[in-house]
C-alpha cells in the first residue's frame, strides 16, 4: 500500500513540464500536460513521455512534409525526457526508502551499485509499474513451487510478468521465512477470486513416526499419513552442543569402531551405517558452529571432510 501511494505521488512530483519548440513548431506546456495525463494516461509513467514525444514528432513531420533523421528524432525525445526529474530506478527507490524511514542505499557510481536481496523485488516492482513491459512471454502455463516462500510483492511481479494459467503449490508449514505467512490470504487479491483451491493432506515423504512428530510440533492435525513405519523419534537433552554432537556421531553410526563395539555380537558385514547424514540447526550461526565441531570430530575418525 505504501509503495502504491508512492507511485501515485510520483505522477506529480517527478515531472517538470515546459514548452518545446522544434523547426518552428511549438508544443505548449499545457498541451503537453494534457497529453501526458489524459491522452496517454494508460501508459506507465516512465514510458509515457516517449509517447508524447512521438506525438509531437509526428506533428512536426506532418507540418514540414518530411521525416526527421534518426539523430534529430532522438534529440527531440531527449528534450521531452528531461521533463522527468529522474528516470533512475535506483534513485527513485532510494527516495522511497528515505520517505518511509528505512536505511538508504549507498550513493555510489553507477557501476558500483549493488542491491541487497530484500531490495531486489521492490525495485523490480517499481520497474514493472513505471516502465512498459513486453506482454507475451511465450509461457502458456506457469508452475510455482514452494509457494509459502514467496512474498506478496513477488506474486505481484509474477502476475504482471505472466498472463497465463498458473499452478501454485506448497506447504505453509515449510516456510523458510522467520514468520509464517498464509499466502492464500492475499493470492485472491492479486489473481482474482476465481482461483481454485485444492487441499492435499496426505503425507508420503516420511514415516508415520517422523510425520506425526513433526505435525505435533507444528500443530498440524488434518493430515492423513501414508502407512510406512520406521524407528520412533527420540528426544534427548544435553548440557551443551559439544556433547550433543558426540551423540549425533554415535547415533548416525559414523564412528566405525564405536559401531563395531556396540554390535559385537553381529558380524561386521551385518552392521548398518549411513552413507549420508544431515544435522539441522535453527540458525545460520548454530549451523556454522555445528559444522566446525563435526568437521573436527570426523577428521579425527579418518573421514574425508
Regions found by a protein language model. Give the residues of each.
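Inter-Walker segment of RecA-like/P-loop motor cores
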Residues: 1
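Conserved helicase NTPase catalytic core signature
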Residues: 4-141, 153-155
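Conserved helicase motor core of SF1/SF2 NTP-dependent helicases
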Residues: 103, 128-141, 148-305
Amino acid at each position: 500500500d505504501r509503495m502504491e501511494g508512492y507511485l501515485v505521488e510520483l505522477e506529480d512530483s517527478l515531472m517538470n513540464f515546459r514548452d518545446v519548440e522544434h523547426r518552428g513548431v511549438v508544443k505548449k506546456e499545457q498541451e503537453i500536460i494534457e497529453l501526458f495525463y489524459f491522452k496517454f494516461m494508460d501508459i506507465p509513467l516512465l514510458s509515457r513521455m516517449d509517447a508524447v514525444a512521438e506525438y509531437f514528432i509526428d506533428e512536426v513531420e506532418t507540418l514540414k512534409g518530411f521525416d526527421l533523421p534518426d539523430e534529430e528524432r532522438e534529440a527531440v525525445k531527449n528534450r521531452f525526457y528531461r521533463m522527468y526529474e529522474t528516470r533512475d530506478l535506483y534513485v527513485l527507490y532510494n527516495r522511497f526508502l528515505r520517505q518511509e524511514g528505512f536505511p538508504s542505499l549507498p550513493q555510489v557510481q553507477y557501476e558500483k551499485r549493488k542491491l541487497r536481496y530484500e531490495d531486489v523485488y521492490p525495485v523490480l516492482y517499481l520497474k514493472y509499474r513505471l516502465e512498459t513491459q513486453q506482454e507475451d512471454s511465450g509461457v502458456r502455463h506457469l508452475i510455482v513451487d514452494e509457494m509459502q516462500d514467496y512474498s506478496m510483492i513477488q506474486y505481484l511481479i509474477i502476475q504482471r510478468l505472466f498472463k497465463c494459467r498458473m499452478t501454485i503449490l506448497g506447504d505453509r508449514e515449510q516456510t523458510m521465512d522467520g514468520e509464517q505467512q498464509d499466502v492464500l490470504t492475499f493470492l485472491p487479491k492479486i489473481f482474482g477470486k476465481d482461483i481454485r483451491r485444492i487441499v492435499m493432506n496426505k503425507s508420503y515423504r516420511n514415516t508415520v513416526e517422523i510425520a506425526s512428530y513433526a505435525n505435533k510440533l507444528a500443530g498440524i492435525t488434518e493430515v492423513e499419513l501414508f502407512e510406512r513405519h520406521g524407528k520412533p523419534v527420540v528426544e534427548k537433552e544435553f548440557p551443551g552442543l559439544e556433547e550433543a554432537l558426540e551423540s549425533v556421531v554415535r547415533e548416525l553410526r559414523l564412528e566405525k569402531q564405536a559401531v563395531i563395539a556396540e554390535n559385537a555380537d553381529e558380524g561386521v558385514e551385518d552392521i548398518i551405517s549411513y552413507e549420508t547424514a544431515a544435522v539441522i540447526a535453527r540458525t545460520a550461526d548454530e549451523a556454522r558452529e555445528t559444522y566446525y565441531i563435526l568437521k573436527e570430530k570426523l577428521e579425527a575418525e579418518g573421514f574425508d571432510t
